Amino acid sequence: MKRILLLTALLLFSVMGLSQNVYKASNFNIKSDGVHDNTTSIQGAIDFIASKGGGTLEFSVGRYVTGAVQLKSGVSIRLREGAVIVGSTNIYSYKGRKAVFWGEGVENMSIFGTGVIDGRGPALLDDIAAQIRMKHIPEDAVVPTLVYLKDCKNVILKDFILRYPATKDDLYIIEGGNVTVDGCYSDMR
């Protein structure tokens, strides 16, 4: 029994990035002003951390606007209290992807902390409707959610708030294995 508890604790610490390098979002020119689109900077930070063998990208207090960001194996996202990942209200920021944070075939990653992922769903849906009316996008265009994971393994989603998705569901997990969701709160006011 002690052996199982020890192995579980070791897996939890390694997946959550507690034994890995921690990289502050501000070091990657990621702006916390709630205005600038940080999609390229956040993706660049995740790609860099993955190329270094993994670690944690840490967001401190602020509002970080982004479109779709691809998660990578070995890279965790930490949302400190007061950190809000704010989904872009421009459908083109998602490039046809299904979520603000999305991953397919990702292993050993986590999103954790007491921050918020805010999809600004009503405003995004207004933009999608306008783009459909102008025939700029098809009527069956992908409407992004907040977190989308497909065929992912050894994933922990812990303690953050999911707010205002543009879809009925804020979190999609399709297949995969050893995915833990613990202490997350859905605020769909």
PLM region spans:
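Extracellular/periplasmic carbohydrate-active domains that bind, remodel
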Residues: 18-189
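Bacterial Sec-dependent N-terminal signal peptides
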Residues: 1-22
